[in-house]
Amino acid sequence: KEVEYAVMILDELYHESPLSAAALSTRRNIPSPFIYRVLKKLEARDILEIRRGPKGGYSLKADCEKLTLYDVICAFENTFIVTECLKSDYECVHNNDFNCRMHRQFAWIQHLLKEEFQKANLSSLLEEDPE
């Protein structure tokens, strides 16, 4: 859910900034406890910046031509995995030490998804009229 909220926040800030946390929360109906957590993680990854004061608020810091959806996902997930069995420390109770057919399929799907998320820059995702 945090990644979904992050994309909504980035969409708002892409089109108008700076915006306060309260404005972002209201516009996208994101509960206050979540908005601050998401904003903090995006700021920690240098995706957003905050300006204090009466005309302050949150703004995009990262270049949206270079920032990818994968970068946004990684701001919230330590590792990008589609299923638990792809974790390096996962012990499968069904197949001992061997990678089963499902594991190989999930690994391939993960590879494809990661590639696509790395290709999808934020500018292309957030444009009003994508080509």
Placement of each model-derived feature along the sequence:
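N-terminal helix-turn-helix DNA-binding core of bacterial DNA-binding proteins
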Residues: K1-I30, S59
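Short, hydrophobic-biased segments on the C-terminal half of alpha helices
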Residues: L10, L39-K40
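Key DNA-contact positions within bacterial/archaeal DNA-binding proteins
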Residues: P33
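Glycine-centered, phosphate/nucleic-acid-interacting loop/turn motifs that mediate DNA/RNA or nucleotide
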Residues: D46
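Short beta-strand "wing" residues that participate in macromolecule-binding interfaces
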Residues: I50
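Minor-groove-contacting beta-hairpin "wing" of winged helix-turn-helix DNA-binding domains
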Residues: P54-K61
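Non-DNA-binding regulatory cores of transcription-related proteins
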Residues: K61-E131
